[in-house]
């Protein structure tokens, strides 16, 4: 597998996964792995990974969670290329496909998936300093897509009873819950991530069910990077 001069190949999980990433551009964070482990998955599920990036969530689901098939959708051409090469590098062509496209204009049919997972850009467009590296800026700030865009796509892609899982800042949970409900996505599972036992919550992982009944299960918290502190 050829890589470009500005890329690296990194190995994870005792050699189970090899990942092509840019040396300096947008590299996946542990958030993606925590989300991929959090989402409720059945072996027969058909999964869509929105904003797939280099493909890390799709790859983890295929290798560690053994899902039947994952389709990744990625806006940026360079990241789409990396995701496709990562699939080939790990010989997972029969379990993962990646499409370049915009989640605001879905290239898949309605009701395509049992599960949608998304590690969206969650820094508000006007909050903080915008990274001059465009790939990082799009991945981290609500520049190209908003929370409503993500929920619109999730609702469109899911079959009734299907599940959407995402990760978002803990201090925006009330906003996420309210907007999920306006999209008929009932919050069903919640797990909070703390930097350490002495700090306020930083992130939250939420799973909603399309047209689900009310009732929220709150899972034990995660501190730091959880089991991914050593990879």
Q: Where is each model-derived feature located?
A:
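Short, structurally constrained coil/turn elements
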Residues: 13, 41, 92, 181-184
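SAM/dcSAM-binding transferase cores
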Residues: 198-231
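General small-molecule cofactor/ligand-binding pocket signal
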Residues: 20, 97-99, 188-191
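Mobile active-site "lid"/loop adjacent to the S-adenosyl-L-methionine
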Residues: 120-149
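Conserved Class I SAM-dependent methyltransferase catalytic core
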Residues: 144-201
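Class I SAM-dependent transferase core
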Residues: 2-42
């Amino acid at each position: 597998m050829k890589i470009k001069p500005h890329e690296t190949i990194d190995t994870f999980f005792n050699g189970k996964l090899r990942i092509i990433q840019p040396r300096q551009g947008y590299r996946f964070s542990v958030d993606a792995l925590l989300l991929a482990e959090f989402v409720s998955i059945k072996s027969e599920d058909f999964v869509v990974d929105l904003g797939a990036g280099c493909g890390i969530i799709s790859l983890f689901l295929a290798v560690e969670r053994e899902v039947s098939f994952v389709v990744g959708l990625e806006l940026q051409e360079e990241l789409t290329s990396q995701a496709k090469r990562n699939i080939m590098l790990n010989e997972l062509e029969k379990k993962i496909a990646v499409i370049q496209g915009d989640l605001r204009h879905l290239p898949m049919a309605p009701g395509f998936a049992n599960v949608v997972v998304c590690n969206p850009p969650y820094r508000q467009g006007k909050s903080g300093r915008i990274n001059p590296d465009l790939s990082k800026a799009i991945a981290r700030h609500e520049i190209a897509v908003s929370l409503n865009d993500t929920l619109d796509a999730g609702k469109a892609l899911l079959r009734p009873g299907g599940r959407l899982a995402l990760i978002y800042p803990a201090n925006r949970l009330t906003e996420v819950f309210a907007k999920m409900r306006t999209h008929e996505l009932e919050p069903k599972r919640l797990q909070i991530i703390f930097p350490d036992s002495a700090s306020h919550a930083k992130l939250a992982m939420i799973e909603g069910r399309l047209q689900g009944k009310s009732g929220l299960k709150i899972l034990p918290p995660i501190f730091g990077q959880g089991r991914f502190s050593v990879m």
